[in-house]
Amino acid sequence: MNRIIFCTFLQKKSEGQDYPPYPGKLGEKIYNQISKIAWKEWKLQQTKLINEEKLNMFNQNDRKKIEKYMKLFLFNNE
């Protein structure tokens, strides 16, 4: 059975994630507030950012940067 949540990104009810897609408290927040559709949009944006800014996901500073972008993208109204 699909989980229906109110997606804060889309501002409407939508199918929720099957599991937290990110570790920790942020992952739980995403699980509870971000739909599969919104997460897919973020993944596309993330790929663009990684490529355009030549980010290296093995580099801790670059991972922190992409996390910051993710928070802004998904929760920019908070």
Curated annotation (Swiss-Prot):
GO molecular function: iron ion binding
Signal sequence range: none
Gene3D superfamilies the UniProt entry points to: Fe(II) trafficking protein YggX
UniProtKB keywords: Iron
A cellular component term, taken from the record's GO annotations: cytosol
Matches recorded under InterPro entries: Fe_traffick_prot_YggX, Fe_traffick_prot_YggX_sf
Residues spanning the membrane: none
GO biological process, one term: cellular response to oxidative stress
Origin superkingdom: Bacteria
PANTHER family linked: FE(2+)-TRAFFICKING PROTEIN-RELATED (PTHR36965:SF1)
Family, per entry: Belongs to the Fe(2+)-trafficking protein family.
Function: Could be a mediator in iron transactions between iron acquisition and iron-requiring processes, such as synthesis and/or repair of Fe-S clusters in biosynthetic enzymes.
Protein name: Probable Fe(2+)-trafficking protein
Natural source organism: Buchnera aphidicola subsp. Schizaphis graminum (strain Sg)
Source species taxonomy: Bacteria, Pseudomonadati, Pseudomonadota, Gammaproteobacteria, Enterobacterales
